[in-house]
Amino acid sequence: PGTVEAYDMEHLAGDLVGLMDHLASDKAIFVGHDWGGFVFWQMPMRHPLRVAGVVGVNTPHWDRAPADPIELFRQRFGDKMYIVQFQDPAREPDRIFGSRVEQTFDAFMRKPLAPPPDKPTAPPIAGVGAAAKTNLAFPQMIAAYDAKFDPRTPILSAEEKKVFVDTFTMTGFTGGINWYRNFTRNWQRSKGLDLRSKSTLGVRA
């Protein structure tokens, strides 16, 4: 879809209902990981009669933020944080990623570095910056990225990477980035939605 609004929660949840209708399925168990989990948590709030269960891997249900999430991201991480940058009406991040498709997947599809020997309990090192504000400036990271200087191990074979590169060379990144451009809209339009009355089970792993 060409419009930003086509990627908001109402449309994405509606797409899942449309898929179920196409498959003649009255109910489904939805399993989502990371950002996909956020979409699936919308289902029992927006379409409760179509939901047999929801599993969020890495994404528990969060209550509605007390303020516009874009402003919260900006306050905590600064203007260079990738989600904040994605709001740019000039769509500069789309251009950066779209003109460096192979670089983008070279950078993101790698294993993190192991913790230093003197700090065995430290979190893995992603290798893209020294601080949160630097780590999250993804457009600038990709613009300056050179795989020759990246010590991390790729997680994709050349054949697997080619699938991603060929696909995004054809489609561009705007559709995916439009997901982030709906954060404010989703927040504005989710007032009154509540999952706390439903049966939920949180399992930490």
Where are these regions (language model features)?
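Flexible "cap/lid" subdomain of the alpha/beta-hydrolase fold that forms the substrate-access gate
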Residues: 2-31, 35-205
